[in-house]
Amino acid sequence: MRRSYVLLAFAIVLIISIISAQVEADASSDAFADAVADAVADPIKGKKIMKNMGKAMKIAGKVAKAMAPIVVPLIVSAAGK
């Protein structure tokens, strides 16, 4: 009984995080389009913008790699039971 509450809470948190990530992805795609437009208009400023975006993508990749060993087994165990 207690385990089902934990899995339900985890599922709710996961759904909320997926929704917020989707909203953030929509906003970041708009920001990316603006950054590309700025890069085309001003190559010097654009190079700096693209460099910063590359750093942000590397950080996001590291976060995803760190979370995967924790999140994936939880999802698999929740789906299997």
Curated annotation (Swiss-Prot):
Annotated tissue distribution: Expressed by the venom gland.
Family matches, as InterPro entries: Pilosulin (IPR049518)
Maturation propeptide residues: 22-43
Signal peptide: 1-21
Modification after translation: Truncated sequences of this peptide have also been found in the venom. It is possible they have been cleaved in the venom.
Key word Ligase present: no
Assigned keywords, A-Z: Amidation, Antibiotic, Antimicrobial, Secreted, Signal, Toxin
Cellular component annotations (GO), alphabetically ordered: extracellular region
Modified sites of kind Alanine amide: A79
UniProt function note: Cationic amphipathic alpha-helical peptide with antimicrobial activities against E.coli (MIC=3.1), and S.aureus (MIC=3.1 uM). Also shows histamine-releasing activity (33.6% at 10 uM). Does not have activity against S.cerevisiae. Does not show hemolytic activity, even at 50 uM.
Protein family per UniProt: Belongs to the formicidae venom precursor-01 superfamily.
Protein's name in the database: U-poneritoxin(01)-Om6a
